[in-house]
Amino acid sequence: MMTIFFNKTDLSRNDAEKIISETLNNCDDGELYLENSKSESILLDDGKIKNSTYSSDLGYGLRAVTGEVVAYSHSNEISKSSLKQSADNLSSTLKSKKGVYNHKIPKRNEQFYKNINPIEEKSLQSKLELLKEVNNYTRAKSGIVHQVTASFSGEHKSIEIIRSGGEVLTDVRPLIRFNVSVMLEKNGKKETGVYGIGGRQSYDEYL
């Protein structure tokens, strides 16, 4: 279980589980989907920082299914009043529908990647230094290098799914990307080559 969704709000885990169970009582399926997403990007163009961004988003989605009817509500505010409002909206949509909640879902507890946060494991300065090294190395290879653009992007998502009855499923999803674009110019002719690598891994693969 994760604490990040409940440590800065008036909504407790017990409150959330109670609201979910009451809302999904007469439904066939449904869940509360909580997500905390952080992302960053750094772009170096000809040795200068052209762009550097960071964002952090927190929110939830509440879904209920009865027969062929699917009701959904979402919000960027995780609070008791917000979740209660979403639950009321779903109950209103499904008020004439009755179903039996399916507690038996297939589970595959396989770890496909490490539980890491690539954004926080390395400093911004260390990432910039590597991008500068790429720029200097590439330009030293040939005098016809006209432009070098190198970038890092990283993402980290924490996800928790709470189903009726208090069943909890969690996942942490890291993601990084490293790109290099090089433009060569000779006798008035320009050509560009691009290469990129990445995946659900750590910046340690490159830094």
Regions found by a protein language model. Name each.
Residues 2-21, 25-41, 81-171, 202-207:
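Acidic low-complexity segments
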Residues 29, 39-41, 57-61, 65, ...:
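Broad gene-expression machinery/nucleic-acid interaction feature
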Residues 37, 67-69, 78, 155-157, ...:
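Generic structural motif
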Residues 40-95:
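N-terminal alpha-helical targeting/anchoring segments
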Residues 47, 165-166, 187-188:
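Detector for glycine-centered tight turns/loop "hinges" at secondary-structure junctions
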Residues 53-66, 169-198:
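Short beta-strand elements
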Residues 69-71, 110-116, 194-200:
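A short small-residue
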Residues 76-78, 195-204:
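Short, solvent-exposed aromatic-acidic interface loops
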